[in-house]
């Protein structure tokens, strides 16, 4: 284990120095995944095992781990690998995970960002936060307990939040004698439940022991009846080809960069599609068109940018653009929605009620929304729907919202950035919920050939800088 603790330094040496090592890391594909399941299924231990077996632990960390394992560990004489991840003092002393803990590690094939999410029901909102940026979910099942309510809850939330790759890991197989029948039974149980989930899921199953490392990074000699890949092999090989490249261009403007009179750029992260120099783009909601003149980054100009890249676009024309505006391909006609049906994960003690107004943020755009009605709340255990008057803490339901101004929205399953929103309490400024757009309602087309480009720009300018004039949006907004 001491040898493993020096492995990162050894990897740097093998690559020929720090710069060569960093260059190799930059060109690896990235997989974001989370671990979730019921209470004490071994999520933090599994992450600790992955870090340990992929040689991501430094000597001082290992020394501290030995000391802490003896003082507050839960595994007797063995290393308590969960302590590598459970950072909060309350977590370490209780042996549970409360907050979402993020960790980074890499192998020769891929880079990973892990979100260790809490298993307790009262922290389901934390799990939803962790799942919102992930491509794959590891659902841990305790081999002594089987598929539990929280496992079903997390499966539903993960798929609701757009995750299509699920790995069902039956953990603690050492406590049931590594019996194949136990693994097979829980696999059948989960597949029976999964019939209620979306049909386009990629579900894989693996039996393992996170504490001892069986089938985590190396095959288990104690489960020779299992001929499938190890967990790490699944993580390294799962197909996460970024389908966002094939999607329509979406570039939400986060910041207008104007350091001097000679430069005006629009900074943000490319959400979907590909943008290139010379491409014709349209600015929404104004509808003004222009051409991409430059794609600026910290490392120099690009000729083309891909989804996920933080860039600054310079347009060929002087156009009035502000934070919250959206750049799309000039050939596209995108609708702005006055109302929308939104799947809501509620995160506040105070329930969501009909008639209440909240501030919301969508892709950098901030406005106000009113709850028109709650169509139903999902009963997580059975995935049935029931009529409710309010949506409580950790509740998930379908809600109709009415916006103060038309918003440019996509279905969340199509685009997380332009289809996802957060609810903010207007008094405390606390985030109280997450919304996932299912359907835009009462839309108006942004194309309107009755007005010239000058008229549209002037109208947008007046509404932005002279709101007390009460000017109406020429495209149908307020």
Curated annotation (Swiss-Prot):
GO terms for biological process: hydrogen sulfide biosynthetic process; sulfate assimilation; sulfur compound metabolic process. Its EC number is 2.7.7.4. It catalyses: sulfate + ATP + H(+) = adenosine 5'-phosphosulfate + diphosphate. Residues 37-44 are annotated as: G1. The keyword Transferase applies. Keywords: ATP-binding, GTP-binding, Nucleotide-binding, Nucleotidyltransferase, Transferase. GO terms for molecular function: ATP binding; GTP binding; GTPase activity; sulfate adenylyltransferase (ATP) activity. Residues 209-211 are annotated as: G5. PROSITE patterns: G_TR_1, G_TR_2. It comes from the Bacteria. Residues 28-244 form the tr-type G domain. Residues 171-174 are annotated as: G4. Residues 116-119 are annotated as: G3. CDD domains: CysN_ATPS (cd04166), CysN_NodQ_II (cd03695), CysN_NoDQ_III (cd04095). GTP binds at residues 37-44, 116-120, 171-174. Pathway: Sulfur metabolism; hydrogen sulfide biosynthesis; sulfite from sulfate: step 1/3. Residues 95-99 are annotated as: G2. Heterodimer composed of CysD, the smaller subunit, and CysN. Belongs to the TRAFAC class translation factor GTPase superfamily. Classic translation factor GTPase family. CysN/NodQ subfamily. HAMAP family: Sulf_adenylyltr_sub1 (MF_00062). With CysD forms the ATP sulfurylase (ATPS) that catalyzes the adenylation of sulfate producing adenosine 5'-phosphosulfate (APS) and diphosphate, the first enzymatic step in sulfur assimilation pathway. APS synthesis involves the formation of a high-energy phosphoric-sulfuric acid anhydride bond driven by GTP hydrolysis by CysN coupled to ATP hydrolysis by CysD. This is Sulfate adenylyltransferase subunit 1. It comes from Yersinia pestis. The lineage of its organism: Bacteria, Pseudomonadati, Pseudomonadota, Gammaproteobacteria, Enterobacterales.
């Amino acid at each position: 284990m001491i040898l493993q603790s020096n492995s990162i330094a050894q990897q740097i040496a093998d690559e020929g120095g720090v710069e060569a090592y960093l260059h190799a890391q930059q060109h690896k594909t990235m997989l974001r995944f989370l671990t979730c399941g019921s209470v004490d299924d071994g999520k933090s231990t599994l992450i600790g095992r992955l870090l340990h077996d992929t040689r991501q632990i430094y000597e001082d960390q290992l020394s501290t781990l030995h000391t802490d394992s003896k003082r507050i560990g839960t595994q007797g004489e063995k290393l308590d690998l969960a302590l590598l991840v459970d950072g909060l003092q309350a977590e370490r002393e209780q042996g549970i995970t409360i907050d979402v803990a993020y960790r980074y590690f890499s192998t020769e094939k891929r880079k990973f960002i892990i979100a260790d999410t809490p298993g307790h029901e009262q922290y389901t909102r934390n799990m939803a936060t962790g799942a919102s940026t992930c491509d794959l979910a590891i659902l841990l099942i305790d081999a002594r307990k089987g598929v539990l309510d929280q496992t079903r809850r997390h499966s539903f939330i993960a798929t609701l939040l757009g995750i299509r790759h699920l790995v069902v890991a039956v953990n603690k197989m050492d406590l049931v004698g590594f019996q194949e029948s136990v693994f097979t039974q829980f696999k059948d149980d989960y597949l029976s439940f999964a019939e209620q989930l979306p049909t386009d899921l990629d579900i894989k199953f693996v039996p393992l022991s996170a504490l001892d490392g069986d089938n985590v990074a190396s095959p288990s000699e104690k489960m020779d009846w299992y001929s499938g890949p190890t967990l790490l092999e699944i993580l390294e090989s799962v197909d996460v080809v970024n389908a966002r490249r094939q999607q329509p261009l979406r570039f939400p403007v986060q910041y207008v960069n104007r350091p001097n009179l000679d430069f005006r750029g629009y900074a943000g992260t490319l959400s979907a599609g590909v943008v290139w120099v010379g491409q014709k783009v349209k600015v929404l909601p104004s509808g003004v068109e222009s051409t991409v003149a430059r794609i600026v980054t910290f490392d120099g100009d690009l000729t083309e940018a891909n989804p996920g890249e933080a860039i600054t676009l310079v347009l060929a024309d002087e156009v009035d653009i502000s934070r919250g505006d959206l750049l799309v391909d000039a050939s596209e006609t995108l609708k702005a929605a006055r109302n929308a049906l939104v799947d809501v994960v509620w995160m506040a003690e105070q329930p969501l009620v009909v008639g209440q107004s909240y501030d919301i943020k969508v892709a950098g755009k901030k406005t106000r929304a009113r709850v028109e009605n709650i169509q139903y709340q999902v009963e997580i255990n059975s995935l049935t729907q029931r009529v409710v008057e309010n949506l409580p803490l950790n509740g998930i339901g379908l809600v109709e919202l009415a916006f103060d101004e038309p918003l440019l929205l996509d279905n969340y399953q199509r685009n997380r950035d332009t289809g996802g929103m957060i609810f903010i309490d207007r008094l405390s400024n606390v985030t109280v919920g997450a919304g996932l757009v299912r359907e835009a309602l009462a839309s108006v087309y942004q194309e309107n050939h009755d007005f010239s480009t000058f008229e549209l720009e002037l109208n947008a300018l007046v509404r932005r800088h002279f709101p007390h004039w009460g000017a109406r949006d020429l495209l149908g907004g307020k």
